[in-house]
């Protein structure tokens, strides 16, 4: 990103869009991994106390921001060479988001919480065992210290700069985005 933004000059305009946790119809990465874990009975617990907020970006809002950036990113413009966080602007607890999706799909929700310290220690043991066995720690749904830290850290960003410079205003709120996503998952048979 630094190199791309630094390349912006009088003849070439560049811009960076920084979405966080993209979701929506045709998602093949974020929600499918969570849904599979829940359907397989492998999402019985939340990690931590649930107070950590995360931002989510519905795909249509991301597209809207990309189009706005493309329209405004010309050499010499204030947008050129800038980076913009783009989310729905509605931070919520990660597991609150997940539970809303699971509930609408009639999948089991986590029933208890594991304290951060215990989850982190268990992840350390799991990583050690996976290393001994030669398993791939890079797989998407692994139980790792990184995953535990991620779940127990705030991940939300101000979209004020995108609002100001790009005229960005999310058109689809979280509730509607979840509803549309779940409808698509039901239509296409997510499993």
Regions found by a protein language model. Give the residues of each.
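Alpha-helical substrate-binding/gating segment
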Residues: 35-44, 54-107
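Conserved sequence/active-site signature of Rossmann-fold short-chain dehydrogenase/reductase
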Residues: 22-24, 62
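Amphipathic terminal alpha-helices
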Residues: 157-165, 169-191
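Short beta-loop-alpha junction of Rossmann-like oxidoreductase domains
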Residues: 25-30
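Terminal hydrophobic/aromatic helix or amphipathic segment near a protein terminus
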Residues: 103-151
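Active-site Tyr-X1-5-Lys
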Residues: 1-18
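Short aromatic/basic micro-patch
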Residues: 16, 56, 91, 156, ...
